[in-house]
Each structure stands twice: as C-alpha cells, then as structure tokens.
Amino acid sequence: GRIVKQRAEDGLLEDTFVFYFGDHGGVMPRSKGYAYESGLHVPLAVRIPKNFRHLVDHKRGDRTDGFVSFIDFGPTVLNLAGIKPHKELDGVAFLGQGVSAADLAKRDEVFGHADRFDEKFDMVRTFRKGKWKYIRNYQGYYADGLQNNYRYRQLAYDNWRDLYRADRLNPVQRQFFERRPVEQLFDLEADPHEVNNLAGDPDQAKRLADLRGRLRSKMKSINDLSFYPENRMVTDALGDGVAFGRKNAQQVSRLSDLA
C-alpha cells in the first residue's frame, strides 16, 4: 500500500502496472514447498493504469481461468514496454500487444516442480492440463511428511505427526506420512485436495500416458538438471546452469528416459 500511495503522490500511478500476488503459504502442511495445488496455485491481481489500458484486452474487474506462471512475468513486462521477448526467454506474455483475453482464457497447461527445501530434497515434477493433473514422484519412497526443521516448527505439522504416531488418522490423513506412488493423476474438479489417485484406473490409462509424455517433453525441452547429483551441479553448473544444460542436453534426455 505504501508504494501505491507513493506512486499516486508522485503522479505516476496511472503510468504504473501493479502486479499483486500471494506467496505459496508456509504454516499449513502441503502448502509452501509442495507440488500440490495448495502449494502451487496462488492468487494474482493486476491493476491496469488508465494511460495504458489500450494495451490490455480486458475490462475492469475481469477474471480469467487461463493459466499463468511466474516465469511469464518477464515476457509480460517486456511486451507491455513494447519490447519483443527473446524466443529463448522462459515464459510467455499474458498481457500486452498480441495477447487477447480470449487467447489467455484458452491457456490450460502449466508445468510445476519441487526439489530442495532446506535440508529436505525431494524431486517432484507436475504437468497440469485443464482439470487434470499428473504428478511424477522421482523419490516416492520419501513421505510428504519427511522431517524438515522449518516445517515442524509449525503446530499443524507437529500435531499431525503426533496423531499419526498415535494411530489416530484415517487412511486419507495417513497418506502424508507414508511413501507415495511414483505416478499420481488427479481430477481437480472432483478432487481439489488431490487425495484420490486415479493413476491406476484403467479408464484413465490413455490420459495418464498423454500427460506423462507431455511432462517428459517439457523436462527435456528445458534441460531439467535435477537428474544430476548436487555435488556435480556445484562443481560444473553453478556458474552457468543454462550453458551446462545445453551442453549436456542429450545426456539429460537419456537420464529422463532412464528415470
């Protein structure tokens, strides 16, 4: 609020785009650091300044169901400034010239990931298309409730684990402390909390294979480096991870297929 007030006092508010978004939680289990929707899906509001409304194909108060990722912010700001985003830049503009409200509403795919969080390492990748979400747990032998000092300072985590150890949880509640399946598939409309895994449902076999392929293609396209151990990353990729990924693209692809 202070920044917006200052922009108004300086006479610059109607020349300023304001992007207002939430964090990924932190005190509730399955929020910050997790690849569930409770950890990935955050609110976003954009204030369009009067002097630049001609650049945006939205009316005041409009809402959209189109998917936006944080990597889209860079290309969006460049596009609003009249600068064509470089083709190798991650993300896609969601406002500005060439981006209609109808086009944005059609965007129904998004990639998600989780890796290291403090002393906890857990490689997870996700691909969502519309209401369907695919999760690949590369280290499914780890439970979601694996010890993490930051998290277990929060009462909800600590109390939940105490109830698990006392055998006072139902099967759904126990999932958080037990090993996860390698693959998970969720219908987010019917199951917004992602507890009913449909990956083993024969009726969903075709959809499972499709989303699995989409995720693998995405990981290869960005040269996902998490297949390498961290000590290798520190010695060989810390200076320029992008260059390291390009140089080792074929190996990344083979590791992805192997995993």
Give residue spans per PLM region.
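A generic secondary-structure signal for well-formed alpha-helical elements
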Residues: V4-R7, G11, T16, P49-F52, ...
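C-terminal, low-complexity/hydrophilic appendages and adjacent surface loops
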Residues: E37, F117-G200, K206-R207, T235-L238
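Short, solvent-exposed loop/turn and secondary-structure capping segments
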Residues: V4, P29-Y34, V56-D57, N79, ...
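Histidine-centered active-site microenvironments of extracellular/periplasmic hydrolases
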Residues: Q6-S69, D90
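Long, internal low-complexity/basic segments
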Residues: H41, D167-V182, A190, L198-A259
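Conserved beta-strand positions that form and line the central face of beta-propeller blades
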Residues: V27, L44, A93, V110, ...
